[in-house]
A protein has these predicted regions:
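Divalent metal-coordination and catalytic microenvironments
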Residues: 14, 30, 35, 61, ...
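Active-site environment of divalent metal-dependent phosphoester hydrolases
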Residues: 76-79, 117-123, 149-150, 189-193, ...
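Histidine-rich, glycine-flanked metal-binding segment
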Residues: 1-10, 16, 20-65, 85-86, ...
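Histidine/acidic residue-rich metal-binding segments in metalloenzymes
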Residues: 126, 167-271, 285-295, 306-327
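His/Asp/Glu-enriched, well-ordered alpha-helical/loop segment
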Residues: 216, 294-396, 415
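Metal-associated gating/positioning segment near the N- to mid-region
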Residues: 62-133, 154, 205, 226-237, ...
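Active-site mouth loops of central-metabolism enzymes
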Residues: 84-97, 153-170, 199, 220-222
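Divalent metal-dependent hydrolysis catalytic cores, especially in the metallo-beta-lactamase
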Residues: 98-124, 138-149, 180-193, 219-220, ...
Length: 421
């Protein structure tokens, strides 16, 4: 859980990143008053009133930055290669325990805010409430509750299948009544056995009905898109975020679409490319199957083809970014083979796709927070804002892998007890 603190906590380090991409403040200090940032800047300019109760922590050559914001998680999954179809067969009580375990793991890794992109039944709602009541440790949660899918579509097994304009609009209203913070739409097929990832699922009219209803209530929309037609449909329907953004044709071939990229940039839509979930599936499946003696020539060929497809996707993200498309960091973990607590892998992949280390850090802090609608609450260190902070050894703007070396995590001004000496 979290450790109680004096009214003021003063932490100092070699540098501070505020999450916006501004130059680092050298010889920095962050002053916390309760659950808020009271002051920040050069240590010589940050002062505590005489006689005030203050706890001081000096981290030497480390970096202070905002708590990370993972814009895409599925907390009910174990991250061990279990298919979503099989995850959905578990009892909700077991899934809630799995989700609580994953939430704690993410918090300990430095993620202080997350967007939950689809769970079964009431699991996400229950976990969010449990974290709010401090019954279980976890990041601030932005949830959709359940993704809306066509009958037999990807993730329909989580409990929100709807078809037709009236039915999908009603499903949006139902989820908002239950307490959804945003609406997740499955605009194409995916890994679900009864779906086709290369084809669009919803029509433009159905997508527009969901987006209109969400926007009428002041809520954002995000859509899973693994086909070019689904991306085009979502642009036509004014969806706020395109997830995966894969330009596959119905026959499974990939063709980069400069026309759609230009529209994404012009619309200021966010793209969450989810690169590492694919890399994790390639690397970890190869490792596990080889250890089990089940790495067949056929599977090896499939994994080699997947690696080539990943290279194409990395290049596509680079080209989209160069065209002005806004990129947000969201892991998609612990889906598939992507283990929980490893969000840094996705941030690193964005850097490999052409973002500077500094911009990749922004994509996982202030940028991610803005993309999921909590830009005033998370992802940035500033006076008066929630004191969610991360301290890492080294400088992630020079070496992004420094984000792995977590010294401490602060949530609402309190140091998270991670069981680390």
């Amino acid at each position: 859980m979290t450790q109680p603190s004096a009214r003021f906590t003063l932490i100092t380090a070699a540098r501070l990143l505020d999450g916006t991409g501004a130059a680092a403040v050298e010889q920095a200090a962050l002053l916390i008053d309760g659950d808020r940032v009271a002051d920040l800047g050069r240590a010589s300019h940050v002062h505590v009133a005489d006689g005030a109760s203050v706890e001081r922590r000096d981290y030497g050559a480390a970096t202070i930055l905002p708590g990370l914001v993972d814009a895409h998680t599925h907390l009910v999954a174990p991250g061990d290669g279990t298919l979503g179809d099989d995850v959905a067969r578990e009892d909700d009580d077991i899934l809630l325990l799995q989700a609580a375990k994953n939430a704690r793991t993410l918090l300990h890794s430095g993620v202080t805010t997350l967007r939950e992109n689809g769970a079964k039944g009431k699991v996400a709602f229950s976990l969010r409430e449990g974290v709010r009541r401090q019954l279980a440790p976890g990041p601030r949660m932005v949830i959709c509750g359940r993704p809306i899918a066509i009958t037999g579509g990807h993730m329909g097994y989580f409990g929100s299948e709807a078809d037709g304009e009236a039915a999908v609009r009603a499903e949006v209203r139902k989820l908002l009544k239950e307490g959804a913070d945003y609406i997740k739409i499955v605009a194409s097929g995916g890994s679900t056995r009864t779906s086709d990832p290369n084809r669009a699922s919803y029509t433009v009219a159905e997508l527009a009905a969901m987006t209109d209803e969400a926007h009428r209530h002041g809520k954002l929309t995000a859509a899973h898109c693994t086909s070019a037609q689904s991306v085009q449909n979502c642009l036509d329907a004014d969806v706020d975020m395109v997830i995966h953004c894969i330009f596959n044709e119905p026959d499974g071939t990939y063709r980069f679409r400069p026309d759609l990229v230009a529209r994404l940039a012009a619309a200021r839509a966010w793209v969450n490319p989810t690169l590492y979930v694919m890399k994790a599936g390639i690397e970890r499946q190869r490792e596990v199957r080889e250890r089990e003696g089940r790495l067949t020539p056929e599977l090896t060929a499939q994994l080699d083809a997947a690696r080539r497809a990943l290279d194409v996707r990395v290049d596509a993200v680079r080209r989209m970014s160069e065209a002005g498309v806004r990129m947000t960091a969201g892991s998609d973990s612990p889906w598939g083979w992507y283990a929980p607590g490893e969000f840094v892998h996705e941030i690193h992949m964005l850097a490999q796709a052409g973002l500077s280390y500094a911009d990749a850090v922004v994509a996982g802090t202030a940028g991610a927070a803005e993309s999921i609608g909590v830009g005033t609450l998370a992802g940035r260190l500033a006076r008066g804002r929630p004191a969610d902070a991360l301290v890492v050894r080294g400088d992630p703007t020079r070496d992004i892998t420094a984000l792995w070396d977590v010294l401490d995590v602060y949530q609402a001004g309190r140091r998270v007890e991670r069981g680390v000496a």
